[in-house]
Amino acid sequence: MTNIRKSHPLLKIINHSFIDLPAPSNISSWWNFGSLLGICLILQIATGLFLAMHYTSDTTTAFSSVTHICRDVNYGWLIRYLHANGASMFFICLFIHVGRGMYYGSYMSIETWNMGIILLFAVMATAFMGYVLPWGQMSFWGATVITNLLSAIPYIGTTLVEWIWGGFSVDKATLTRFFAFHFILPFIIVALVMVHLLFLHETGSNNPSGLNSDSDKIPFHPYYTIKDILGVLLLLLFLISLVLFTPDLLGDPDNYTPANPLNTPPHIXPEWYFLFAYAILRSIPNKLGGVLALILSILVLALLPHLHTSKLQSLMFRPLTQTLYWILVADLLTLTWIGGQPVEYPFIIIGQLASILYFAIILIFMPMAGMIEDNVLKMD
């Protein structure tokens, strides 16, 4: 008799995706982050659902409803902080996942990579709208500043901004629609994740060497299920430590002040995971130029498959490009630091140099290094 997991129409799909999936025998712990992102998404949807049961998306009651969740709802404080810090974990895993794709040349699976970029944009949009919901000072002013960027679009900009706001400023209509979008987007993300996995399983996983691994495959279960469980336990340990010991470590104190349209906070800064993009935005004096640089800072990832000049896929055997890669990582950390600093000397010039370096490494230096390495290794 055939095993039910191999014959049942639904279980068969799960079996081919998570159980009998042929996986390369040498994929390292950097490949754990895909499953960790799945866990983060499930956690965010679960905690978000319980928060939505008690939250009210009205400007007069939004702030106090969040306070009510933390004070009066059973374990409401835990759910709220798991959700807030879960977002930070989500982005840590996202950045490592993308970074791993860049390092090992996984972007050569173009469909999977492009789907991943769409997912990154969707998660960033969801996180931004979620940050507006508690209706604190930083929520309100963050929403005002970021949505206002769309007014830089020629001709239709102002109309577009007012259409998104549902009025002439960020108000009740804006909050209500942001809540609606914040609720629906994670489910759209789940659908996109399925497409992402569908594309991935068409080609199979990449591996650290960047070489074809068809001749050396092992079943996903039990080898990588056990390996993933270890990753999940470490992630949960880190998240729970953060939630129970320093839940406000990554937040902004300004968000504990109810939104006041008449009082601007001294420094408007987004959550830490957007600071690198915010620094790139601020480093260009022109409004439209800044917005374009902001979008391109993520969209530039879509160019990676077309900028790949080396005959070797992975950076494992390419020391010159490896060096550039780690300079890029340091540059992104610098941008993250600059994004949280006030707009004054020397931070302005550091931000501008770091922004130029970011685009230069990806668009110029890495493709050049690939050609140099091919020459040195006599790959042609």
Curated annotation (Swiss-Prot):
Q: What else is known?
A: Heme 1 (or BL or b562) is low-potential and absorbs at about 562 nm, and heme 2 (or BH or b566) is high-potential and absorbs at about 566 nm.
Q: Could you tell me the Gene Ontology terms of the biological process aspect for this record?
A: mitochondrial electron transport, ubiquinol to cytochrome c
Tell me which cofactor or cofactors this protein depends on: heme b
Entry's Gene Ontology cellular component terms: mitochondrial inner membrane; respiratory chain complex III
Reported function? Component of the ubiquinol-cytochrome c reductase complex (complex III or cytochrome b-c1 complex) that is part of the mitochondrial respiratory chain. The b-c1 complex mediates electron transfer from ubiquinol to cytochrome c. Contributes to the generation of a proton gradient across the mitochondrial membrane that is then used for ATP synthesis.
The annotated topology with respect to the bilayer is:
Multi-pass membrane protein
Which of this chain's residues are annotated to bind heme b b562?
83, 182
Give the stretches traversing the membrane: 33-53, 77-98, 113-133, 178-198, 226-246, 288-308, 320-340, 347-367
Q: Give the cofactor note.
A: Binds 2 heme b groups non-covalently.
Gene symbol here is MT-CYB
Can you name this protein? Cytochrome b
Organism expressing this protein natively: Eliurus ellermani (Ellerman's tufted-tailed rat)
> Which family is it part of?
Belongs to the cytochrome b family.
Q: Which InterPro entries match?
A: Cyt_b/b6_C (IPR005798), Cyt_b/b6_C_sf (IPR036150), Cyt_b/b6_N (IPR005797), Cytb/b6-like_sf (IPR027387), Cytochrome_b (IPR030689), Cytochrome_b_C_euk/bac (IPR048260), Cytochrome_b_N_euk/bac (IPR048259), Di-haem_cyt_TM (IPR016174)
Q: Which UniProt keywords apply?
A: Electron transport, Heme, Iron, Membrane, Metal-binding, Mitochondrion, Mitochondrion inner membrane, Respiratory chain, Transmembrane, Transmembrane helix, Transport, Ubiquinone
